[in-house]
Amino acid sequence: MSSSDIFIGETIGTALLILLGGGVCAAVTLKASKARNAGWLAIAFGWGFAVMTAAYISGPLSGAHLNPAVTVGIAIKDGDWSNTPTYFAGQLLGAMIGAVLVWVAYYGQFQAHLTDREIVGGPGAQDTTAKSVEAQEKGAGPVLGVFSTGPEIRHTVQNLATEIIGTFVLLLAILTQGLNDEGNGLGILGALITGFVVVSIGLSLGGPTGYAINPVRDLGPRIVHALLPLPNKGGSDWSYAWIPVVGPLIGGAIAGGVYNVAFA
């Protein structure tokens, strides 16, 4: 596949991934959303179906990595890093585009949520929970969770380890499936399996950090959150932002090495 196919495929696929995955986060979080408070099960399945859809659509163009950790794991497995920068560029651009599309689709809900005194504070606001106060002190705005991940308990080693472990599981599941005969991605069955692996990771390992398991899934939307003209949006929590980038890259690299030792 050509560099242009890779870039276009990763941009489109990652944009779809963030549109559908970030969209479910918006749906369950924002005021005036019909799905508000649908819960963690909706988020886990929403992200799984997002991965499934994006992988199926973009697979013929780029192989549907959609995740720098996947690109790193496959590069280690194959010993070929030549297209890595192209994959990374398409993935980051796509993630940012997807986050902007979520904002467009939920524009009214964002405005309603961020101008609600009970949510953002101010005169007449009710007392916020201790968790909300702690989040604000750490620089996390009231809608940052729609865009990116954040830990329930801030513990650098634990948070990093959780992202490494979750991404390792994802990559091992992907690498052991292998590419289909045409080399154009996981195919229909592979996309389905990978989607349900993501659901499983979300349900079992998502509690501590929100399971980024993908550097651009967190970084791209976090950049968009910082840039968008959202009222009362608060901080983008840059002090935490390195963990959902570095952790998945380490997990992907370990999975690539383990695959070569145990499965190749």
UniProtKB/Swiss-Prot annotation:
The keyword Transmembrane helix applies. The chain crosses the membrane at residues 6-26, 38-58, 88-108, 159-179, 185-205, 243-263. One of its GO terms (cellular component) is plasma membrane. Gene3D superfamilies: Glycerol uptake facilitator protein. A motif (NPA 1) lies at residues 67-69. A motif (NPA 2) lies at residues 214-216. It holds the Pfam family MIP. Induction: By glycerol. One of its GO terms (biological process) is glycerol transmembrane transport. Disulfide bonds: none annotated. Keywords: Cell membrane, Membrane, Repeat, Transmembrane, Transmembrane helix, Transport. Belongs to the MIP/aquaporin (TC 1.A.8) family. NCBIfam families: MIP. This is Probable glycerol uptake facilitator protein. It comes from Streptomyces coelicolor (strain ATCC BAA-471 / A3(2) / M145).
